[in-house]
Amino acid sequence: MCRGVQHPLRGIFLRNYLLQCTRNILPDVMVAENEHEVNVYDAIDFVLTNFAEMNKLWVRMQHQGHSSEKTRREKEREELKILVGTNLVRLSQLESATLETYQRLVLPGILEQVVSCRDAIAQEYLMECIIQVFPDEFHLQTLDPFLKSCAQLETGVNVKNIIISLIERLHCLQPEEWQDQRQWHRCHHSR
């Protein structure tokens, strides 16, 4: 049903409703009790798919209507961004999703969608969302793919602000929270 709704605004709200309805029924266990039950990987797949579809609809909104309505459309998109970001919040709330799961499935799925959407407004907002909703430990262990994705963003994206947000988020960590002490030393003494 959700894929059948082609109007971007209606589709976004329908997918947000779907996400809200499934919030308490998505599985949050690493291993299912039997082979017919679902586990956290199914939940991750569901939310990532919903995120990708919502983001496509959100990006498509910029092309709806006459060019004279561009300012109004951008304002609408700005107001709707939180609905798209809710998918990332939901992914971050999955307690069974480990660092390994984040590195292998969650972050690559998100970054692929962010980079491929080729929309500066979406890219900047979603990169900020990633920084804000996922734990510091996850960011420390995935700096390389995150920064590589920053290099692939559209020219209209303020990458400097994204990097500053990430630095501010990680700056407050204590040295024992960094697995590699040399990495902490380089970070704090290279300024």
Language model segments and positions:
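Long amphipathic alpha-helical scaffold regions
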Residues: 1-191
